[in-house]
Design a protein with these regions (language model features):
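Residue patterns forming the tRNA-binding/recognition surfaces of aminoacyl-tRNA synthetases
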Residues: 6-8, 17, 33-194, 212, ...
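Residues immediately within or flanking Cys/His clusters that coordinate Zn2+
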Residues: 109, 182, 595-598, 615
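Short cysteine-rich clusters marking metal-coordination/redox-active sites
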Residues: 112, 185, 221-226, 598, ...
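Cys/His-rich microdomains that often coordinate metals
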Residues: 119, 192, 605-608, 622-625
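Cys/His-coordinated zinc-binding microdomains
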Residues: 173, 227, 602-605, 619-622
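Short linker/helix segments within small regulatory modules
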Residues: 607-616
Length: 629
């Protein structure tokens, strides 16, 4: 095929109006293993042919009219219908001795998806916005750099589209739409550019609507132009031009709104749609993008990642979820998803969201119960709080920082995933468990209990505000339960303050170590429980062997591990000790605690039975009972 490149052939109908030579052109769309490897090229009737014709500067004539017939200037076939002229062409080829063979074959052909009728591609005169004139493409690429794109990779996507897109064809031949409102000179084919004409069109459209253009458009020409010289164009605007114009009639027409918009939000397919048209119109009219930030999301699919379809029976309807599970489960699912990809939904996924919701709700319910009767008079100073409470405040500071960062970046999944982990691992499985004894058994005036309830109050306040955008009704219910019907809605409140003094990285590092050590101890307790040595951790006495002296000083490990007593030994690890791979320098032995069980706090202590009146209580519980009686 390459040997033919540059050669020319005579047209088979030479002398009959086709006296031009036909060039041989190399085309990447032609396959050597299909057919002859030689195909007819018509730049007016195919995308690949058009591109090839543009590359080699071939003419692109309008040969076929709207009714499917050849134009009057086409030799031999003027007025013939493109689908009814085959026999005539074959006869002319035969008469010209240019027909090598004829045969009916079956091959793929473009067709209408609705009517199933065959189709042809054809070029027609259209109106375009040039991306090169006035440097529109360059302006758009510069504007992209000044926009915040979420997710960040969407910036490269729209940037590549702007770099490679052709000029924007803004005209359409449809019966309904916004008219182009252009007059073209019949001889020169140039559009009429006259400010007074445009102003008359604007005033008419403002009064009569877009239909004004179709009601005697010659009236807009005024006295300066002869209607006989001009033809009104009845094409309509590309609907993407309409959508891209929303910046004009939504933002600029409303004084309470600002331009550019804070955010444009749509599906990922709108990079070449609404986002693109808005960008080009913004740059073309205002020299800037019409938005400060753009968020794009994927599409909802079923649990297997398949597109939803009624025929497949895999449609998950939001209203059905709202009726059966409640709208908050649906909202929680939304913030739990990575919306930069397609969002999967189905029964198992929603069941997981129910579990997450239940964790949040149970956390709020526990805090509400523990805060019964709490007032601000219980507040101790930060310096007087135990290290455990100060660690929780540090975690609140971390989460508050994360909340603000994630909401600014529209990364809701990262925050609410972290918040669920906080409620599950930090609160329920650790802090609440450790402080249950303090809340239920310590004196109301004890500094540790006051500090605990103060932190509970701060926890509840922050959790409610963080969850308010998602669990709107649950949070309002908890808010009213805490403060009563007289308090204004939480949704009218600002976020609570998070003092910088709560931040304590050194303490956080200590608690990373403490919790790892605690996991070794609780691992040993689980083994003892499974062996039947104890039934609960409060029945245990624990000895921790720490020959490398890694255990932290001034820490009540018995309290953290929820045991009745705990000793630390620096002796070598005995062979019978429980050893964890996480801390292989620690060994733990569990034995049954000595003493009697306090019937109030359930700790097993030797002091139980020593008091003459309260013989079933430990010293701490005796003191509390005496205080309230």
């Amino acid at each position: 095929g390459t040997r033919l490149e540059g050669m020319k052939a005579s047209h088979p109908f030479v002398g009959q109006g086709y006296d031009h030579d036909v060039p041989f052109l190399p085309g990447d769309h032609v396959a050597v293993d299909t057919g002859t490897g030689l195909v007819h090229t018509a730049p007016s009737h195919g995308i690949e042919d058009y591109d090839l014709g543009r590359r080699y500067q071939l003419e692109v004539p309008e040969t076929v009219l709207d009714d499917g017939t050849y134009a009057s200037w086409v030799p031999l076939f003027a007025g013939d219908h493109v689908f009814k002229v085959d026999d005539k062409i074959i006869a002319l080829l035969s008469d010209s001795n240019a027909l090598a063979a004829k045969e009916k074959i079956v091959h793929s052909y473009p067709h209408s998806w609705r009517s199933k009728a065959p189709l042809i591609y054809r070029t027609t005169p259209q109106w375009f916005i040039s991306l090169e004139a006035n440097c529109l493409r360059h302006q758009a690429l510069d504007a992209i750099e000044g926009v915040h794109w979420y997710p960040s990779q969407s910036k490269n996507r729209i940037k590549g589209m702007v770099e490679n897109r052709p000029d924007w064809c803004i005209s359409r031949q449809r019966a309904w739409g916004v008219p182009l409102t252009i007059f073209v000179h019949k001889e020169t084919k140039q559009p009429l550019i006259d400010a007074s004409v445009n102003q008359r069109i604007i005033e008419a459209v403002r009064k009569e609507g877009a239909e004004a253009w179709y009601k005697n458009p010659e009236r807009f020409l005024g006295h300066d132009h002869d209607p006989a010289d001009y033809e009104p164009i009845n094409d309509i605007l590309d609907v993407w031009f309409d959508s891209g114009s929303t910046q004009k009639f939504v933002l600029e027409k409303r004084p309470e709104l600002e331009f550019p918009a804070s955010l444009y939000l749509e599906g990922s397919d709108q990079h070449r749609g609404w986002f693109m048209s808005s960008l080009l119109l913004g740059c073309g009219t205002k020299n800037q993008a019409p938005y400060k930030a753009v968020v794009t999301h994927g599409f909802t699919v079923d649990e297997q990642g398949r597109k939803m379809s009624k025929s497949q029976g895999n449609v998950v309807a939001p209203d059905k979820i709202a009726e059966t599970l409640g709208i908050e489960i649906l909202r929680l699912w939304v913030v739990s998803c990575d919306y930069s990809d397609d969002l999967r939904i189905g029964p198992e996924i929603l069941k997981h969201q129910e579990d997450i919701y239940r964790r949040f709700r149970n956390t709020l319910r526990y805090l509400l119960g523990a805060l019964h009767g709490f007032t601000s008079e219980e507040h101790p100073s930060l310096e007087d709080m135990p290290s455990l409470e100060r660690w929780v405040l540090h975690r609140l500071h971390q989460l508050d920082t994360l909340f603000k960062e994630c909401t600014q970046a529209y990364n809701f999944q990262a925050f609410y995933s972290a918040l669920h982990h906080f409620c599950s691992a930090d609160l329920s499985a650790f802090y609440f468990d450790v402080r249950k004894d303090v809340v239920y058994c310590d004196s109301a005036q004890d500094i540790k209990r006051r500090a605990t309830r103060t932190v509970f109050d701060l926890l509840l306040n922050h959790l409610l505000h963080w969850l308010a955008p998602v669990l709107c009704f649950t949070v309002e219910e908890a808010w009213l339960a805490r403060f009563g019907e007289d308090r204004e809605s939480i949704h009218l409140n600002f976020l609570p303050e998070t003092p910088e003094a709560w931040k304590n990285e050194a303490l956080a590092q200590d608690f990373d170590v403490l919790r790892a050590q605690r996991r070794v101890i609780t691992g040993a307790l689980e083994v003892a429980r499974s062996q039947g040595l104890i039934k609960s951790s409060l029945q245990a006495h624990v000895t921790v062997f720490d020959p490398q002296q890694k255990m932290l000083p001034k820490v009540d490990y018995a309290e953290l591990a929820i045991t009745s007593s705990l000793d630390i030994s620096i002796e070598a690890l005995p062979s019978t000790a429980f050893i964890s791979s996480d801390f292989d320098h620690l060994g733990v032995q569990v034995s049954v605690a000595s003493g009697h069980k306090c019937e109030r706090c359930w700790r097993v202590l030797k002091e139980v039975g020593n008091h003459p009146i309260h013989s079933t209580l430990c010293d701490r519980c005796v003191h509390v009972i005496d205080e309230v009686t």
